[in-house]
């Protein structure tokens, strides 16, 4: 059963005590889907949740500095690994919950790939490669297809995926390299073209979840819930891939 069917009921759940609040940090690209999954888990477990979104790099820094999160849903595998290695997360709790893909999107070009090389094609939006894994993958792709030199002077960097989408949505950047899942984001105007970014052109976008609070049973339950058939079905429906 698709989890969206629960939505009208779940937000009517009764308030619970403060210690039952599940605090989840999630990478911006996965925020919408995480919200759906958390609402379904709320229905199942009877817990309230607080969702914090941002770039993976910034959320990672917050966890390291003691931010009170129970679960971290990253857009990469590296930050969860570092959190485990540094003693900031529960050892052995991390795993890949989704794998992402990129597209080139344009509101003006007829040839999306061609717009990357065309100096007159306007700005190109992508997330910050330093803090956002999807931005790093976009940069790797541009280098792999020999478009970096033509594109670098035209790039506008969003702090995260959602800000990069905002640049495209407002027309500040007619071309964007964004997650495939956001091609039809409500904020986006109609595309004149889209093109799939070859997965071989960048490091895999393996998104991992890791448990931060060892003693929070709701957090452990949610991390396990993400492995369920219903959760995996929702993740795939959102446009991500899941591992076997």
Regions found by a protein language model. Name each.
Residues 1, 18-19:
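Absolute protein N-terminus
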